[in-house]
């Protein structure tokens, strides 16, 4: 599986609701380039991609292989799930799709690595769990999700943490993070 690279240490995750397009415009205007949509349907994803071609868009909460295939075909740049399922990793590998499996234990992280994942989403994204993965599995790139600004600052000091994801942040947080 290809390595997911971002020069942005903060990934913004947004719920798909009536304010989505205006929020995306605000984020793009503020200089953000990587945004993750929470539970986006392929049609919504395609529409957003047409309106915001400069954004690298991902989709979170992928639970089944058909969802992964649909968002990949719709043009998502990456996807993630809240848990570990080998079938999702195997499907992502077929499409060479950037996929972040959720891992809750070192054993799940090791299994993900054995299946070809170079990056995982620690859930829960606690500092202690990410520190453990950083120490014992330093080759895995970590993308913790649903973190606060205070947690983000601490997590980003770990060598293995590539980026953190903040869910529905206030615009002020976005300005501080840049």
Q: Predicted regions: what is each one?
A:
Residues 1-75, 93-94, 172-178:
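Conserved N-terminal beta1-alpha1 strand-loop-helix module at the mouth
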Residues 12-16, 33-41, 55-63, 76-84, ...:
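Catalytic beta/alpha-barrel core
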Residues 23-24, 65-74, 107-116, 129, ...:
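Catalytic cores of alpha/beta
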Residues 30-33, 52-55, 73-79, 93-100, ...:
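Glycine-enriched alpha-helix->loop->beta-strand junction motifs that scaffold or abut catalytic
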Residues 43-44, 66, 87-88, 107-109, ...:
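Short secondary-structure capping/turn micro-motifs that flank functional sites
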Residues 78, 82-88, 121-129, 159-178:
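Glycine-rich phosphate-binding active-site loops on the catalytic face of alpha/beta enzymes
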Residues 131-133:
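Strongly charged, low-complexity linkers/loops
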Residues 143-147, 166-169:
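A generic structural motif
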């Amino acid at each position: 599986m290809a390595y997911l690279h971002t020069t942005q240490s903060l990934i913004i995750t947004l719920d798909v609701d009536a304010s989505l397009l205006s929020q995306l415009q605000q984020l793009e205007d503020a200089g953000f380039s990587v945004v993750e949509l929470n539970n986006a349907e392929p049609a919504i994803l395609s529409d957003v991609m047409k309106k915001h071609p400069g954004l690298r868009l991902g989709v979170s909460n992928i639970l089944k292989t058909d969802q992964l295939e649909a968002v990949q075909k719709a043009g998502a740049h990456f996807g993630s799930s809240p848990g570990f399922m080998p079938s999702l990793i195997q499907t992502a590998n077929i499409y060479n799709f950037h996929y972040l499996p959720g891992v809750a234990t070192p054993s799940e992280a090791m299994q993900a690595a054995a299946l070809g994942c170079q990056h995982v989403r620690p859930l829960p994204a606690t500092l202690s769990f990410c520190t453990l993965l950083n120490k014992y599995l330093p080759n895995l790139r970590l993308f913790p999700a649903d973190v606060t600004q205070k947690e983000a600052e601490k997590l980003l000091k770990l060598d293995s943490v590539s980026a953190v994801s903040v869910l529905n942040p206030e615009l002020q947080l976005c300005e501080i993070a840049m």
